[in-house]
Amino acid sequence: MEQSDYGKFFITETPRHPDHPQSRDRDSDIPWCDTFYVSGGVNGQVPGAYYLETCMMLRTGSTPDLQVPHTHDFGEYLLFLGTDPDDHFDLHGEVELWVGDEKRTITRTTAVFVPAGVPHCPLVVHRVDRPFMFITTGDGTDYSREEDK
């Protein structure tokens, strides 16, 4: 392959998420199937790359780490994206998400911005009529969290 100044920025493979490595397996006990987990510049291969996780929601449920309210020292987007080409704003599912002490129900394509230091979660998937995308990203390079006390 030719040498390239920018080839390292095309990320096609990432390690599994350490908090729930089984989520890469389609038939795991996790409600989603992970595709990308970018943290720490993909083990230093892409310095400066922001934190990113992409998943496809396949079934109902939650994970222990998403049951606990937590904060980050970076701002984070939580994106819920419908996949119906006839109505891409219909999530075809229902997600319960807590931000601070507010419980919200998500049934439409939604972007939630969570400022640094704001507690969020639990996140519980109550209904999946059609798989939809769940993407999280933040303006930090390393994923870290602190459980809310």
Segments (PLM) and residue ranges:
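Conserved metal-binding segment of the jelly-roll/cupin
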Residues: 102-126
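A short, N-terminal "cap"/entry segment at the start of jelly-roll beta-barrel domains
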Residues: 1-67
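Double-stranded beta-helix
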Residues: 1-19, 123-149
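A short beta-strand-loop-beta hairpin characteristic of the jelly-roll/cupin
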Residues: 80-107, 145-147
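Residues at beta-strand starts and edge strands
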Residues: 50, 75-77, 93, 130-131
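Short Gly/Pro-enriched loop/turn and capping motifs at secondary-structure junctions
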Residues: 84-86, 119-121, 140-142
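A short beta-loop-beta micro-motif enriched in histidine and acidic residues
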Residues: 62-77, 85-92
